[in-house]
Amino acid sequence: MADKTPGGSQKASSKTRSSDVHSSGSSDAHMDASGPSDSDMPSRTRPKSPRKHNYRNESARESLCDSPHQNLSRPLLENKLKAFSIGKMSTAKRTLSKKEQEELKKKEDEKAAAEIYEEFLAAFEGSDGNKVKTFVRGGVVNAAKEEHETDEKRGKIYKPSSRFADQKNPPNQSSNERPPSLLVIETKKPPLKKGEKEKKKSNLELFKEELKQIQEERDERHKTKGRLSRFEPPQSDSDGQRRSMDAPSRRNRSSGVLDDYAPGSHDVGDPSTTNLYLGNINPQMNEEMLCQEFGRFGPLASVKIMWPRTDEERARERNCGFVAFMNRRDAERALKNLNGKMIMSFEMKLGWGKAVPIPPHPIYIPPSMMEHTLPPPPSGLPFNAQPRERLKNPNAPMLPPPKNKEDFEKTLSQAIVKVVIPTERNLLALIHRMIEFVVREGPMFEAMIMNREINNPMFRFLFENQTPAHVYYRWKLYSILQGDSPTKWRTEDFRMFKNGSFWRPPPLNPYLHGMSEEQETEAFVEEPSKKGALKEEQRDKLEEILRGLTPRKNDIGDAMVFCLNNAEAAEEIVDCITESLSILKTPLPKKIARLYLVSDVLYNSSAKVANASYYRKFFETKLCQIFSDLNATYRTIQGHLQSENFKQRVMTCFRAWEDWAIYPEPFLIKLQNIFLGLVNIIEEKETEDVPDDLDGAPIEEELDGAPLEDVDGIPIDATPIDDLDGVPIKSLDDDLDGVPLDATEDSKKNEPIFKVAPSKWEAVDESELEAQAVTTSKWELFDQHEESEEEENQNQEEESEDEEDTQSSKSEEHHLYSNPIKEEMTESKFSKYSEMSEEKRAKLREIELKVMKFQDELESGKRPKKPGQSFQEQVEHYRDKLLQREKEKELERERERDKKDKEKLESRSKDKKEKDECTPTRKERKRRHSTSPSPSRSSSGRRVKSPSPKSERSERSERSHKESSRSRSSHKDSPRDVSKKAKRSPSGSRTPKRSRRSRSRSPKKSGKKSRSQSRSPHRSHKKSKKNKH
């Protein structure tokens, strides 16, 4: 048994090694080598000593690897193959191939090398095999036993193990036994044993201490970086660790997580957060646009848009992001004013996000706050001191330089040195570092740095005393030497030098206090003025695009996209393009390119882009001017071929517009005529206005149409005398007097005045048109009672006689009364009516222009919309109000005109009465003339005694005709005044009335009067025959 035990142990150990070779990295043998058991100790003691002391001998290592394994591997493989084989085995499978042998040998070499490496580590670490083997320090190769015991208690540093060390861990090893993933340094040095002297520190220990110091400095920097602001005290380690755990970077997130679930996208109820979450951002919006939109409310700490990275996020067609303000107050105002507002056609959805670290300096400062952080302009005084007057008003002119030293010292003592914190972080850190060493080392250090860094531009602030950086450096150094804290200082003005200027320290981070009320009002007042207009940079970009536009597809496409993206300012863009096309000196290719731009914008005006339809509306008002300017350019072209090419390109645009149906065909034909020079813009406007002023043909029909037929077709005695006068005289009376009669107005209202479709403007002039269409005069009504009495006395003979004589005398009457008097009256009435209608049309055009302007302002939002009314109802209400106002003015003018006419009539009637009283013998002369015997009337006794009323009427008509001819010859320019005087004569005779009828176009009455004397025998003969019967 004694012989078997060593051999058996040796055999078992060899089997263990051979199995380790085939087990791909098991660490059981490794554990046996480092920590042997009691049963194996006698058999393992012999090979361990030479392996430990002669590990550098290559031949010994090869013998150690090769000697026991090759002999044992073959019988083991054969036994395994025999145990699991079915049937006969081939001889080829019993022997390993050359490649397998090489791989097996390579594995054995790696295994042996790993064991030797572990034993090498164990020589310095200790014999405890359960712990991880790492480097601690160097030592002697053949160390004594006491030294090994001491090494076990020394501090340990984790070092990443080799790739073989991971394979030697057993599979059932717990995760707690694995080495930590962070660099941990034991700060306390383990105590030495009694009686052992302290050794001299090796290079490895010195390197370890240096690593400790670097790690401490790194931890300190992380603590400083984790603060919310440099003006707050440093936080504890637990706070910094919690912040680092709460705010993982976006880089560590999985790419599959949507942006909506990003850190900060949900309100956690933090009352101090200044971070706003934006949930609905236009994909075309970038960080710069967000800064300009949100920066109006205060300085911004950070702006971030979460750009889509996956197809799913791009399909949403909206982005999200975060905007962090420097203080809570500004963030609350931004949330209140921008939540739900439309920005670039997207409704802004805002909410609170998680707090983010606030940097010392904001990334965006509003222009209203920028002046507080900008340094003052150079003044020429030491340290760039500013006089008090110029500090209040930077635009004030510079004061003249002092003439003597006393004035200079006085100015300098009253000046103020304004300290501004530099915005460049590198320069600010260098200044702070310089101040730290100057305070510690003294002014000699500053002198040495100035001598050494005289050519370094970073240290220029030490030499240039008037720069803002030097002013800040000098103040900060003085403040630290006076006992101020680096984060808090006194803000009162003070004198640094005796009889020197006042120094004004910067405020304690003004960005953390928010914008003042004045700056808030300035930021909000600027917004309405820029509504619907381009910004300065956008206007400059548009002008630059138009200047460099060429007839290329890409250039025109880019310009069209710019126009559609800024469709809110469509009116300004259309004006700018129209102005660019009006310049005659512009080269023809640029003109064609700008016309193509107009065509592209009009084509895309029906696209689903916000406010794109405005271009069709605004271009419609400018296209006439555009093509008029193109016509001027076309006429200035000298070459025939070049002009034809230009013409063909323009006509191509017309054909395309006709296919697109952008505008109606009559409008396109009009534009084409303007371009070809067939129609001028001014003449086109005049021709458009004339038909509206005349309102068609009713005026001519009223003058020349129905009234003549009414007069010719009805017998004289069967119709009222008022109908015999016709339209012109009545219209003249109405033009003169302005007082229409109620009876005639009612009768005329039932007649159709217009024979074409009436326009909406005819409702305004309806009363005046009816008054002008009245065919009777108010003077006829005064004499109507007398005429009715005369007509009752007429007998049946006169009626039949008149009927027979009417047909025979038509031709004579037509020739007799087709005199220039009628034409003159017609022309005068027509001219006056056209003048009146022209004046009224001009007023109506002004009203319509006001209505159009009101509608444009209502649509663009400049005028508020009344609740409960649509746009059309509000426009109609405005038009009715203007028309009512104009009608009231017209009524006032009519009253004044009537008043003046009445005064003139009264004065003329008085004159006429005095004239009639002076001539009382006219009636007697008339009676004598009427009772004189005639050959025909002597045969009838009745006619001699009672003179005929018709003869009297004929005589009166002749006398009145002579008087009217005399008065007309004396007053040729005013025929209406003559007729008015004759009609308004208060004398007993009806001479004025007869004179008026003599000039009328009634052929029956005048014919009867002309025959009253010449055909008296014939008439008396007929009357006598009827009396006999």
UniProtKB/Swiss-Prot annotation:
Gene expressing this chain: U2SURP
Positions of post-translational Phosphothreonine modification: 719, 931
Stretches of the chain forming a coiled coil according to its record: 92-121, 192-232, 837-915
UniProt record, GO biological process: RNA processing
Keywords (A to Z) from UniProt: Acetylation, Coiled coil, Isopeptide bond, Nucleus, Phosphoprotein, RNA-binding, Ubl conjugation
SURP motif repeat segments: 430-473
Similarity comment: family membership: Belongs to the splicing factor SR family.
UniProt subunit comment: Interacts with ERBB4.
Residues modified as Phosphoserine: 67, 202, 236, 485, 788, 800, 811, 946, 948
Segments of skewed composition (Basic residues): 45-54, 991-1029
Compositionally biased region (Polar residues): 7-16, 169-178
SMART domains, alphabetized: cwf21 (SM01115), RPR (SM00582), RRM (SM00360), SWAP (SM00648)
Protein name: U2 snRNP-associated SURP motif-containing protein
Residue positions where N-acetylalanine is found in the record: 2
Pfam families per record: CID, cwf21, RRM_1, Surp
GO cellular component: nucleoplasm; nucleus; U2 snRNP
SUPFAM superfamilies membership: ENTH/VHS domain, RNA-binding domain, RBD, Surp module (SWAP domain)
Record bears the keyword Phosphoprotein: yes
Listed Basic and acidic residues bias regions: 55-64, 97-111, 144-155, 186-222, 239-249, 810-841, 874-922, 950-980
Subcellular localization(s) per the UniProt record: Nucleus
Residue intervals of the CID domain: 534-679
Single annotated GO MF: RNA binding
